[in-house]
Amino acid sequence: KRVNKSWRQDLRFFCGGRLIFGPDVRSVFVILLLIIGPVAVFCIFVGKHLCKDYSNGLAMVVVVVIHTFIVLVLLLRTSGRDPGIIPRNAHPPEPEEDVNLPSNWSGSVTPKLKLPRTKDILVNGVTVKIKYCDTCMLYRPPRCSHCSICNNCVERFDHHCPWVGQCIGRRNYPFFFMFILSTTLLCFLVFVLCVLRVKKLMEENSPHTVWKALERTPASTFLMAYVFLATWFVGGLTVFHTYLIGTNQVS
């Protein structure tokens, strides 16, 4: 019996449970469009000119395509992987032995014991306070949190990412970081190659202003503006998570 049978069915399972997506899996298709669409525009309207203008132009386009493929694989590994879901209990845990019975207990009816909201455990010689989750009926390990969207407790929970439609936790955080890092590099690569295309147009009709060159290649103009804005978002996210990794924190 698979462990995922005990998980909330708000999740989406594919390939016999090998792929696990969050309830907002549709947002993944939006991300796919935002990645594949601009790359397709680049290959069709900019890449063909790079192949003509530069001896290694074809290699430039191939690098972009391969890098895009890597980004998509990392996206799938981030969005379709178990982030570290802790299977919920079917029943509340047994109360500790030192839980006191009510003073007015007659003995004829078993009292309803209320579990403490927190308890202390020892981790590497340090006392850590852990909390009880009423939904999953378990005491959450350190750095574990309950996601209100997926409705599961996730180990080393960082955040629920609406863009990839999945929680980011212990098991998929490395893929998430590599995804945003590789996406940042892809944006930078496309921007530089579009600049090369504009530069070539300026050289062909010298003296040619930048604005005239941009008018002659609207695809490059669009892509440079698009990846510039995208880099502010995903690049800033990459820098932020690099800092978190360096300081051993979660967001």
Give the positions of each predicted feature.
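Hydrophobic alpha-helical transmembrane segments that serve as membrane anchors
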Residues: 1-113, 168-251
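Eukaryotic intrinsically disordered and solvent-exposed regulatory patches
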Residues: 62-63, 118-121, 134, 148, ...
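Short Cys/His-rich Zn2+-coordinating modules
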Residues: 111-120, 128-134
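Processing junctions and N-termini across compartments
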Residues: 127-130, 141, 155
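Short cysteine-rich clusters marking metal-coordination/redox-active sites
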Residues: 133-136, 147-150, 161
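Cys/His-coordinated zinc-binding microdomains
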Residues: 137, 151-154, 165-168
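Loop-to-transmembrane boundary segments
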Residues: 137-143, 169, 176
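Short, non-ligating residues that shape and space the ligands of small metal-coordination modules
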Residues: 142-145, 156-159, 163, 170
